[in-house]
Amino acid sequence: MKLKDTLNLGKTAFPMRAGLPTKEPVWQKEWEDAKLYQRRQELNEGKPHFVLHDGPPYANGNIHVGHAMNHISKDIIIRSKSMSGFNAPYIPGWDTHGLPIEQVLAKQGVKRKEMDLVEYLKLCREYALSQVYKQRDDFKRLGMSGDWENLYVTLTPDYEAAQIRVFGEMANKGYIYRGAKPVYWSWSSESALAEAEIEYHDLVSTSLYYANKVKDGKGILDTDTYIVVWTTTPFTITASRGLTVGADIDYVLVQPASETRKFVVAAELLTSLSEKFGWADVQVLATYRGQELNHIVTEHPWDTAVDELVILGDHVTTDSGTGIVHTAPGFGEDDYNVGIANGLEVAVTVDERGIMMANAGPEFEGQFYDKVVPTVIEKLGNLLLAQEEISHSYPFDWRTKKPIIWRAVPQWFASVSKFRQEILDAIDKVKFHTEWGKVRLYNMIRDRGDWVISRQRAWGVPLPIFYAEDGTAIMTAETIEHVAQLFEVHGSSIWWERDAKDLLPEGFTHPGSPNGEFKKETDIMDVWFDSGSSWNGVLVNRPNLTYPADLYLEGSDQYRGWFNSSLITSVANHGVAPYKQILSQGFTLDGKGEKMSKSLGNTIAPSDVEKQFGAEILRLWVTSVDSSNDVRISMDILSQVSETYRKIRNTLRFLIANTSDFNPAQDVVAYDELRSVDKYMTIRFNQLVKTIRDAYADFEFLTIYKALVNFINVDLSAFYLDFAKDVVYIEGAKSLERRQMQTVFYDILVKITKLLTPILPHTAEEIWSYLEFEAEDFVQLSELPEAQTFANQEEVLDTWAAFMDFRGQAQKALEEARNAKVIGKSLEAHLTVYPNEVVKTLLEAVNSNVAQLLIVSDLTIAEGPAPEAALSFEDVAFTVERAAGQVCDRCRRIDPTTAERSYQAVICDHCASIVEENFAEAVAEGFEEK
């Protein structure tokens, strides 16, 4: 036997290298085969519900890192709630209708307009489901736990029927109407868009300054006067029917020396406009308030059949332009509102593809709206005073990335204005985890217009509306419920398969159809109505869920998307928000803080991370950032997170190895019988347990990460485990001192594994497989530990906080001695302490082997004053010299008692007593050489 064999060197097969990329799929299959999600749900049956409702990602392509962050966050919450006494089911969902899928099929060569619509919709459905299953596999690869066999998908018959019923309730309450108001119109998609489908980019546009000649000045202006107008959308002049001024803005009538014409502009802008137009020696002839100009009539710049009326509008400012804007009610919301109020014609001169129509005039017909500037300039002639290129923020179609226009077309609307206050009141009852989130959603609802819910596309849920022979729209409670029942059985494709009369209740009649003939609506619903109905399609319809949900968790862009549409439909139906809490997340940026883009090549695919590091590292990264704001991610950042993971893993591996001979049923030492340092570590660990439990409850992942890493690095690695080897390796295997420390080790190991499970389930299960004495076969079936408190806890903490200060001072003394070449390693030191009464009392209270805690070979607590050479602090001084004696071959301490023993071992008296007591046979025979 060799002397080293008398040491209790930790033994474990738990590997240092995690091998996550290859092992994770194996564990995931094991969990699936063991039906862990279902078993967890069975364990939680009857417990209070916590329902996190999954906002459905769009089913197109593999998931990106933003999806990963969001869904890992959801998984951490679901797992932590499931292990904290809650019934927390997770039903993943997908949004499956809409233009992107139509675009994919078009790229694949599918020609929608050349094939049967039902066949086309079948292709859309097949593609959408293929993407659902692809993304489902992506999410499962992240280690997510959920009901993967009972997903919710917005194209299923039960979901579509639930959506129709949401619409029906809104129609019954009078919230659905048809109008020809201007809406966001995407010529690239040939469809209306909702606000949530708009994103803003900088766009360079041509702005024109031109003049309208006064036709009837109402006794205020002469007919040789011109009113100067500004526009950034020249094509809309073709539909201009008025000029709008601000009622309280001052306007001046001026005569430039270089002009025979007189002009009206905003007084505040005269100087800048004179410079822009090249006017010199400008004479101000009169000043008017805007309201004085009301109802003056001007000529259209070129259309002699059209007069343009001067009207008042609150939206006019003097921030730019001339203080006067032309008004085309068919091409703008403000224009429409003031135009309708003043009886102006709502003219639309652009078709659904962005092409100018015949009513724009023969010179314009057939041109693309954005290419007509030269023609407009030609038509204006000498009425054009200036033109310039401006860069401004402009709305774009979020899918096609093309600019959009406002365009008045007949559409179906949800009248938000009718129940706006009810929505705002509902917001006040929701808990927001960021105050700005509440303000943002509140302001969006307060300021938004009515919701355009119709779309001129094919792939979606049809609007359940019929038309009588006289054109009357029919959407009664009876007809809508009948459609819902048909969809529930056959799916929404039946709308296209059957004639209108076969979709109506049997025997249905209507006074507007004396011949019994009906037509059906061909528009579909906005996809935000699809996902915005999920509270009914999922929360209300699934037996193990609750409505409202406890939590909605999505990206901050969903304040204008899913949070918004879900809120509107839920309040419209039931008067309550569909969620009790909202937690939002920022965007994922690259390592430099730049937006990720395939064109920039700075995207990170979750699959690439899984191959290089493992999903576990991505999960740990999620907790390492404050995801309520935008966060950065790169392979370098993930490499740093991987180092943190390695530190966590190796620390826990040390605990596994050094409790391999510990049976908690037999070897646990009661708290009251622990050494003071072990009590301290137990208390510190339970403080960590409380911090993590509280942070899980508040969804504060970064708090968990920081607390965990700090405990492992500072409390364990830099202190407790730093001197632990001197106990667990050196002392007798069954000695009280070793069992005391192993008790703490095992307690930390078991509980920290449970605490880690929501974040690192793969690693936690791997550790758990080495804990043979724990009852549950999977750690995921256990409960998170409760934080304990202990008698005299604060006193113990105060004592050890003071000792840590003392330890820091001692380490400075050792460092000085090391720099002076007095010692090399700290075990070569004999440390002499010159304490005052406070420190002396402290060291007595610590009641431990202080030399062992400081990792020095010898320590003397001296009486009397410290020598001048001592390193002095306020309460204590130190001197350091080389320890006397010889190095013990077993404990490596320098000890005066170290000597050659009769059994061929050079060891100190302490080690000799351990060896002689525990290894009598080896002592009798003598140890082998090293």
UniProtKB/Swiss-Prot annotation:
GO terms for molecular function: aminoacyl-tRNA deacylase activity; ATP binding; isoleucine-tRNA ligase activity; tRNA binding; zinc ion binding. Binds 1 zinc ion per subunit. Its EC number is 6.1.1.5. Pfam families: Anticodon_1 (PF08264), tRNA-synt_1 (PF00133), zf-FPG_IleRS (PF06827). PROSITE patterns: AA_TRNA_LIGASE_I. CDD domains: Anticodon_Ia_Ile_BEm (cd07960), IleRS_core (cd00818). Belongs to the class-I aminoacyl-tRNA synthetase family. IleS type 1 subfamily. This is Isoleucine--tRNA ligase.
